[in-house]
Amino acid sequence: MRRCFSKITDCHLGFKNSNFLLVGSEVGSGSVTRTITTTTSERLFSSSYAAHQVDQIKDNPVSDMLIDKFGRLHTYLRISLTERCNLRCQYCMPSEGVELTPKPQLLSQSEIVRLAGLFVSAGVNKIRLTGGEPTVRKDIEEICLQLSSLKGLKNLAITTNGITLAKKLPRLKECGLDSLNISLDTLVPAKFEFLTRRKGHDRVMKSIDTAIELGYNPVKVNCVIMRGLNDDEICDFVELTRDKPINVRFIEFMPFDGNVWNVKKLVPYAEVMDKVVKRFPSIKRMQDHPTETAKNFTIDGHCGSVSFITSMTEHFCAGCNRLRLLADGNFKVCLFGPSEVSLRDPLRSGADDEALREIIGAAVKRKKAAHAGMLDIAKTANRPMIHIGG
């Protein structure tokens, strides 16, 4: 298999946009020698991640509830606000739809804020709102306002399909929304309708432009690559970064209940990178943050950037700092793990903050070192993505 490799030119542990890893490509019979072995590379990562954790603890002392048995510090909470969505994306929701949790069983606004406050007081500094589609929740503006007011929270983000975002974004920004990711898997309107089973491509493009006009930089665009569906648009997506502050994020197709995952649909990172390198040979690897899930790149002359999220072929479990609170109040420590624990039930039974912290901490301590291989993941019972929120 043709692979693209990286050579470290600056091992500075601090994150700076000017620190790059040069990219070479193995194409055809030619090859590029990897300058750092996998073992050495893993040691460098482990060392930088450990150093990052020490800095984090010094800057913001955390409770033990956020540290798992492998020493990973979890400072990033993803909150699913709803299971409802105004699209029916093929990789996210089964064609027949999903059974929605009755509204009384979903977390209320006050419950979301209380639980989020527990995490932030313990050391979480970033919260991302997901769904379903988070913007279909009527009280999203008030939720953003209350969450952004939590002392210690540094970043409030949202992942959205962009269908209704353009008209809501000005107010969401006023309510403290710091950053956003917009999901878009094709630049072709007809293909958009096929992939999402709905119309609305023009509205998503408008939302991207609105975000740029409001000063969001970068505006992150999530693109799930699926063989035979949109892998012919990879370089077209990269072109979006030429004149606009857009960070295009190519995501490997992941298996979840109901999305008919097939390894043949998976376009691995190395293959995507080969296509990009051939078209944009000046692409350069940026120095990534120790807990970054993406491999980040810039291209000479481009205003934006390109990233790759390699959950299937090159997982990033060693530096995982993410936790998930689902719309029904279940707490999930791994995107690909089936294990969940309810925080809603003890909350509604009158549990105090200390009791809730104990439940959270115990779940975090049970987190595994890494998720299973992609073929095993495909066989594991898990929720549809629409229920998890990514």
From Swiss-Prot:
Tissue expression profile of the protein: Expressed in all organs, with an abundant expression in the roots.
Catalytic class of the enzyme: lyase
Domain of life: Eukaryota
UniProt pathway: Cofactor biosynthesis; molybdopterin biosynthesis
GO cellular component: chloroplast; mitochondrial matrix; mitochondrion
Cofactor: [4Fe-4S] cluster
Gene Ontology molecular-function annotations: 4 iron, 4 sulfur cluster binding; GTP 3',8'-cyclase activity; GTP binding; metal ion binding
Keyword Flavoprotein assigned: no
Residue sites binding [4Fe-4S] cluster 1 per the record: C85, C89, C92
Entry note: cofactor: Binds 2 [4Fe-4S] clusters. Binds 1 [4Fe-4S] cluster coordinated with 3 cysteines and an exchangeable S-adenosyl-L-methionine and 1 [4Fe-4S] cluster coordinated with 3 cysteines and the GTP-derived substrate.
Ranges where the Radical SAM core domain occurs: 69-290
Alphabetic keyword roster: 4Fe-4S, GTP-binding, Iron, Iron-sulfur, Lyase, Metal-binding, Mitochondrion, Molybdenum cofactor biosynthesis, Nucleotide-binding, S-adenosyl-L-methionine, Transit peptide
Reactions it catalyzes: GTP + AH2 + S-adenosyl-L-methionine = (8S)-3',8-cyclo-7,8-dihydroguanosine 5'-triphosphate + 5'-deoxyadenosine + L-methionine + A + H(+)
UniProt-listed SUPFAM superfamilies: Radical SAM enzymes
Residue span of the annotated presequence: 1-45
Positions with a binding annotation for GTP: R78, R128, T159, K220, R322, L323, R324
One biological process term in Gene Ontology: Mo-molybdopterin cofactor biosynthetic process
Main location: mitochondrion
SMART domains reported in the protein's UniProt record: Elp3 (SM00729)
Description of how the protein assembles with itself and partners: Homodimer.
Family (UniProt): Belongs to the radical SAM superfamily. MoaA family.
Function: Catalyzes the cyclization of GTP to (8S)-3',8-cyclo-7,8-dihydroguanosine 5'-triphosphate.
Protein name: GTP 3',8-cyclase, mitochondrial
Source species of the chain: Arabidopsis thaliana (Mouse-ear cress)
